[in-house]
Amino acid sequence: MFQIELDEEPVAPKVLEFFKNLPENATAEQSLETFQKTFSFLHENVLEKYTSDLFTPSTLKEELDEQLAQAENNAQSQLSELLKNTKRFVLNYDNDRPEDLEAPEYFTQLVDGVLDKKEDLEANISKYLTKTWSFSRLTLVEQAILQVSSYEILYTETPDVVAVNEAVELSKDFSDEKSSRFINGVLTNFLK
């Protein structure tokens, strides 16, 4: 067996010397100065690398802000791609093969409008749900139908009755009879 003694290594005593020479409550500048004096024997390139690695100020907030900005950019590009694919799917719903169709202006206005006003629409719809039901508890189909119809009622010139009837018909096609009655009730109260 053999034993490694750190005292034989040239760096270990220098680390101890650094900590001994470091003033109590030293500022970053004092720490850097002490480090450079203690490790002056190192080659200039090595000293520069250790100095920049150890004494470059970096805050957690800056690192998190950078990562958050990158994540938001990624999410935005993924959302744009998802929206594009969703529009293509909806436009080709009845087609045997997907075609490159142009979205009607009103369809684009509805989709973009619902996305822009999502929080307001959810808050308005939630006012007309019972205390035991939250908006997030609704099925995704019910959420989408209620958002589109409430957007039509609040922000377009579509007659309110037409918006409600379209919502009820959509819920019959994509959900069940119980859901269509529920949507009719929520939207009827929404109009009052």
Curated annotation (Swiss-Prot):
Presence of keyword Magnesium: no
Gene that this sequence comes from: nusB
InterPro entries: NusB-like_sf, NusB_fam, NusB_RsmB_TIM44
NCBIfam families: nusB
Matching Gene3D superfamilies: NusB-like
GO CC terms: cytosol
Alphabetic keyword roster: RNA-binding, Transcription, Transcription antitermination, Transcription regulation
Keyword hit for Transcription: yes
Protein name stated in the entry: Transcription antitermination protein NusB
GO biological process: DNA-templated transcription termination; transcription antitermination
Single GO MF annotation: RNA binding
Family that this chain belongs to: Belongs to the NusB family.
Function summary: Involved in transcription antitermination. Required for transcription of ribosomal RNA (rRNA) genes. Binds specifically to the boxA antiterminator sequence of the ribosomal RNA (rrn) operons.
